[in-house]
């Protein structure tokens, strides 16, 4: 606000300097001077009035926008409280406290709007002192009530936490009587049965593979087959198949017979 006033005075001073520079060569005429000063004062007064009106309109719009914003935030806060604390008992004193707080807020808003719209700047200096004592008392009362409400909420939250801890510290016997405990026991039994059956199936597969391997080893001969070659003789259009090993064996037999006969001689 002070910046706007300073800017306004600077603009007026620049306007005056421009007018003086433009009309410096005109001969002096007292009647013209009087009319010029009168017109200038009138225009300044009109501009000040228009500026004050525009300022009041802007302040009113700002106040209305801030009021709507605060009301919207208050609604959101109330919805959050209802979602967080839906199980708390109804307390009419809390509603009365909220009503008193909303009334005091509206009074303070009205006072601030009047202060902004008032043309006298002295109100801002003594606005704090001019606030009635009722508003102070109502604010103190609201503060005390809010403190009491916060204390009650803390006590309720502590009791709820204690109850939850006690419920968690109960023995397992009580937990087994519940249907959830029966379901867990059933699931554990089924998992154990499934694990045992899987292990048995794996053992059977391993034993079957070992039996097949031993059977295949027994079926195979101990010594590998000898490599046999065959010679083909074609005589008069007929083929004769002779085994090379048999041929060698016959040759060896003949040699042995010859050696025996020579030794005997």
Swiss-Prot record:
Membrane-crossing segments per the record: 192-212
Annotated signal peptide: 1-20
Annotated protein name in UniProt: Uncharacterized protein C2orf92
Species per Swiss-Prot/TrEMBL record: Homo sapiens
A GO term from the CC aspect: membrane
Membrane disposition: Single-pass membrane protein
Location, primary (coarse class): membrane
Keywords attached to this entry: Membrane, Signal, Transmembrane, Transmembrane helix
Domain of life of the organism encoding this protein: Eukaryota
Location relative to the cell: Membrane
